[in-house]
Amino acid sequence: MKHTIDRLCSQHSLDRQEYLELLQCNDVDTLDYLRFQAQKATLERFGRDVYVRGLIEITNECRNNCLYCGIRQANKMVARYSLSQATILDCCRQGYELGFRTFVLQGGENPQMTDEWVEDTVARIHSRYPDCAITLSLGERSLQAYKAFFRAGASRYLLR
């Protein structure tokens, strides 16, 4: 098994059967070696730094019905909410006071949160906290909207 793990580390790929064998392995020495190699690869790729981000779930309302998602439109068990701009700004204020320097505004594709509203919210956050990074994850938008968000101060956009 050690040979298989070494090959995985060097080639970054195995065949299906080899993956199954690794997943089903119960040998303590093999699992220790696998854990060691995984930690080594993680440290080489990402280092030892940990980055803390202030994640603000601004809405769980969504027009989409993605089966993997807990906030999909058809899920009637979810109590829906949308934060006001004032609440979002207050969350950023509190986060800034606690030392957060990256804010992630995340939520479903809520038609009530227009591109203009998002752009204005980002601009207000950026003007108050110019030393902070702003990341958005609010579903699919137009290219023009992404550009407007960037001009307003958002530096990243996560698209799932």
Where are the regions that the model predicts?
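Short amphipathic alpha-helical segments, especially helix-boundary/capping motifs
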Residues: 11-16, 65-69, 97-101, 121-123
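Flexible, acidic/Gly-rich N-terminal and inter-domain linker regions that tether
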Residues: 1-64
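A broad detector of the eukaryotic-type serine/threonine protein kinase catalytic domain
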Residues: 19, 24, 71-74, 130
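Active-site cofactor/substrate anionic-group-binding motifs, chiefly glycine-
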Residues: 44-97
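Generic recognition of cysteine residues
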Residues: 9, 25, 91-92, 132
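Core AdoMet radical
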Residues: 73-89, 95-116, 121-160
